[in-house]
């Protein structure tokens, strides 16, 4: 609605420029219409008075000191109300047969005092960001502008030791709106230090203005980006280049050393390994093989062999005798 009101005021301001032939738009032309100003002059000098043009020129000339005024954008409605009250006061003076030569300069001085009492706009805080609280309204053109700063903030370098925690704070040094603020995070891996959005991928699990990486590994080397938005409109993009350096922690180093030791002694081809089955000669030749259990087995084997030989001899003897 504010944009529509401003758009409707522009043709009136252009018409005023053509009629009054002033070099620049003043606050008077931004917050009053041509018909309102013409009506006031008609009340002062009459509908078709030869002094009508003189009155119109005097009206704009009295407010020329406000042509380059800049105000806090949020104070527009306050200033608009003040100009509305001024037009009503001038109409009352005209109805009371007052003089426009006195009324217009007096009204302009009062308006200057009101403008000096308005809340000032915040100064632009470099180096980046869409800073709505620093938006200003320019009477020289009846338009507003924000700080001429890029949306992308410079890359911040963060260096951590491998295995430690890396933390990023998505905080800007200018005031943010209080409502509908969201934070989204992206990551460009491979050790890239970049602001090119085509290299980034979303990190859906990262929420809020604070992000932690723990423990930091070499795979985390790259650029992390945080986008601050208000109602889907970007306000700032912050970048953090994470450089992971140094050896891993001591505990991890010892674990890796143990793992490498196991790999060194582990068989390469487990399917080719056969269990050791020593022969009788190997058992007798290796004293360490003659354990009590092995000696017991040897005795059992000897007894079985002797019994088998006895049985075979007896069976042979019976067969031989039965043949005779």
UniProtKB/Swiss-Prot annotation:
Q: Which UniProt keywords apply?
A: Cytoplasmic vesicle, Disulfide bond, Fertilization, Glycoprotein, Immunoglobulin domain, Membrane, Signal, Transmembrane, Transmembrane helix
Listed InterPro entries: Ig-like_dom, Ig-like_dom_sf, Ig-like_fold, SPACA6
The yes or no answer to whether the keyword ATP-binding is present is no
Q: Where is the signal peptide?
A: 1-26
| Highest taxon listed in the record's lineage | Eukaryota
Which ranges make up the Cytoplasmic topological domains here?
Answer: 317-324
| Tissue/organ expression | Detected at the sperm head, equatorial region, neck and midpiece (at protein level). Expressed in testis.
Outline the subunit composition.
Answer: Forms a complex with IZUMO1 and TMEM81 on spermatocyte cell membrane required for fertilization.
Q: PANTHER family of this UniProt entry?
A: SPERM ACROSOME MEMBRANE-ASSOCIATED PROTEIN 6 (PTHR37366:SF1)
What is recorded about the domains?
The extracellular domain shows strong structural similarity with IZUMO1 but does not interact with the IZUMO1 receptor IZUMO1R/JUNO.
Instruction: Give the protein's recorded name.
Output: Sperm acrosome membrane-associated protein 6
Q: Which organism is it from?
A: Homo sapiens (Human)
């Amino acid at each position: 609605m504010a944009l529509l009101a401003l758009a409707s005021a522009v043709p009136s301001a252009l018409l005023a420029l053509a009629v009054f032939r002033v070099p620049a738009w003043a606050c008077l032309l931004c917050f009053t219409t041509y018909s309102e100003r013409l009506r006031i002059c008609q009340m002062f000098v009459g509908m078709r008075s030869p002094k009508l043009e003189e009155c119109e020129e005097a009206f704009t000339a009295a407010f020329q000191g406000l042509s380059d005024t800049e105000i806090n954008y949020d104070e527009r409605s306050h200033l608009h109300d003040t100009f509305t009250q001024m037009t009503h006061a001038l109409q009352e003076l005209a109805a009371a047969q007052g003089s426009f030569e006195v009324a217009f300069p007096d009204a302009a001085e009062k308006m200057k005092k009101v403008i000096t009492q308005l809340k000032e706009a915040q100064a632009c805080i470099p180096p980046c960001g869409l800073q709505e609280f620093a938006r200003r309204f320019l009477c020289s053109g009846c338009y507003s502008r924000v700080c001429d700063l890029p949306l992308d903030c410079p890359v911040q370098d963060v260096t951590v030791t491998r295995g430690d925690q890396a933390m990023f704070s998505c905080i800007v040094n200018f005031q943010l709106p209080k409502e509908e603020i969201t934070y989204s995070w992206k990551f460009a891996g491979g050790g890239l230090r970049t602001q090119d959005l085509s290299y980034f991928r979303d990190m859906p699990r990262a929420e809020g203005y604070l992000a932690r990486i723990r423990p930091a590994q070499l795979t985390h080397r790259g650029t992390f980006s945080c986008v601050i938005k208000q109602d889907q409109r970007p306000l700032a993009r912050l970048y953090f280049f994470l450089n992971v350096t140094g050896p891993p922690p001591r505990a991890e180093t010892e674990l890796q050393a143990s793992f490498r030791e196991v790999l060194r002694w582990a068989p390469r081809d487990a399917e080719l390994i056969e269990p050791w089955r020593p022969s009788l000669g190997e058992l007798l030749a290796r004293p360490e093989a003659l354990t009590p259990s092995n000696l017991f087995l040897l005795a059992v084997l000897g007894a079985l062999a002797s019994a088998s030989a006895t049985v075979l001899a007896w069976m042979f003897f019976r067969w031989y005798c039965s043949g005779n």
